[in-house]
């Protein structure tokens, strides 16, 4: 069977070249006589893998030396608790709620202190991003938290909050590595890897040095950033396969794509094809304010929920899978992460136009 175009929000497509390299090395890696899946995390081979993966991430993202990088189990959802447990030193933090995951992060933080929602786009069903320069931030907040791209509702920030003396913490799960990011604007960046980096099973956190070491003594060992970061992510057995796959994807971005600036151009061109089509007709509708449209997650609906179901079923039969929208939104969602080839977008648009003509 031919490979399908997988528009899943995560786990999602991986570059075919990366998959083929992993396939070639699956049974035996680098003269070790064993698979990465079965080798000791203390072996010289895996030590080289994790060291090289971190070094490549630092190069690709231009991460300064005063930031630590850690490979964590538990996904981004675990980070919702780790952030307040480690950083909420004043007992309060500001949260901007622009969708489901930022709302869940705020709810989790409220278990450990005052998680003040200083702005929200819920009033328009999360179809825009609040003006970050018009928000009344708390100068005594321990940090400001955002979700930089909203997977479910298809929005993204065009600028981020910058408040002197208050660190910015960002969940970048669904946009990481899609474009260059100025790491110095953030105190902490975290992301689950299953959308744009690697298979499911890991989160990566990038934490500025001055934010570490302030967790209370009763914070569980594995919920303390310092535990893993002080041991170069080797305090316990790390998610070895995910780290290996992350390394392959990063090398692909660096060597084949030519870095994140090139990746951004490719992604913006792909998204433009789909948005231009959506704007050219009145059968399918994208509700997001144009300025805040996500480059990674494109949401749309047809005139009727039954037609939405029909579209998703016929699309799957045609080789376009996982287009069903999130249960909170309905409709359709095309997640067009880094690994989605441009031809996948072109063919999807052709299918959408065919469906429109047959069902309008």
Model-derived features with residue positions:
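Conserved N-terminal alpha-helix of the aminotransferase class I/II PLP-enzyme fold
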Residues: 33-79, 86, 100, 108
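PLP-dependent enzyme catalytic core of the Aspartate aminotransferase-like
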Residues: 2-4, 330-360
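Conserved PLP-binding catalytic core of the aspartate aminotransferase-like
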Residues: 284-314
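Active-site C-terminal subdomain of aminotransferase-like
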Residues: 188, 193-275, 289, 358-360
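A glycine-/small-polar-enriched, mobile loop at the entrance of the PLP active site in fold-type I
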Residues: 3-54
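PLP-dependent aminotransferase-like
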Residues: 77-144
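Active-site phosphate-binding strand-loop segment of PLP-dependent enzymes
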Residues: 10, 109, 120-176
């Amino acid at each position: 069977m031919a490979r399908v175009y997988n528009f899943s929000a995560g786990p999602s497509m991986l570059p075919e070249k990366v998959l083929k390299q992993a396939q070639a090395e699956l049974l035996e890696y680098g003269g070790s006589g064993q698979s990465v899946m079965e080798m000791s995390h203390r072996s010289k081979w895996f030590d080289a893998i994790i060291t090289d993966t971190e070094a490549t991430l630092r190069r690709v993202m231009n991460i300064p030396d005063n930031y630590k990088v850690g490979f964590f189990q538990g996904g981004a959802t675990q980070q919702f608790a780790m952030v307040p447990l480690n950083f909420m030193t004043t007992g309060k933090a500001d949260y901007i709620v622009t969708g489901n995951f930022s709302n869940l992060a705020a709810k989790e933080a409220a278990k450990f202190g005052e998680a003040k929602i200083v702005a929200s786009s819920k009033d328009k069903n999360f179809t825009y991003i609040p003006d970050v320069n018009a928000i009344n931030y708390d100068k005594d907040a321990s940090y400001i938290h955002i979700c930089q791209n909203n997977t479910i509702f298809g929005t993204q920030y065009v600028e981020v909050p910058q408040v002197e003396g208050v660190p910015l913490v960002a969940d970048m799960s669904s946009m990481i590595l899609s474009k260059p990011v100025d790491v110095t604007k953030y105190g902490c960046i975290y992301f689950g890897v299953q959308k744009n980096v690697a298979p499911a099973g890991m989160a990566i956190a990038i934490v500025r040095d001055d934010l570490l070491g302030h967790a209370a003594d009763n914070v569980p060992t594995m919920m303390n950033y310092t535990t893993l970061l002080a041991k170069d992510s080797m305090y316990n057995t790390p998610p070895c396969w995910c780290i290996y796959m992350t390394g392959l994807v990063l090398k692909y971005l660096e060597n084949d794509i030519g870095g994140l600036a090139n990746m951004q151009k490719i992604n913006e061109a792909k998204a433009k094809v789909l948005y231009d089509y959506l704007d050219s007709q009145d059968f399918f509708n994208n509700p997001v304010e144009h300025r805040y449209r996500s480059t990674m997650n494109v949401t749309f609906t047809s005139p009727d929920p039954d037609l939405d179901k029909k579209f998703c079923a016929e699309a799957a039969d045609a080789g376009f899978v996982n287009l069903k929208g999130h249960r909170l939104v309905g409709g359709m969602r095309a997640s067009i992460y880094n690994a989605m080839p441009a031809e996948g977008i072109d063919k999807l648009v052709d299918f959408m136009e065919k469906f429109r003509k047959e069902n309008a």
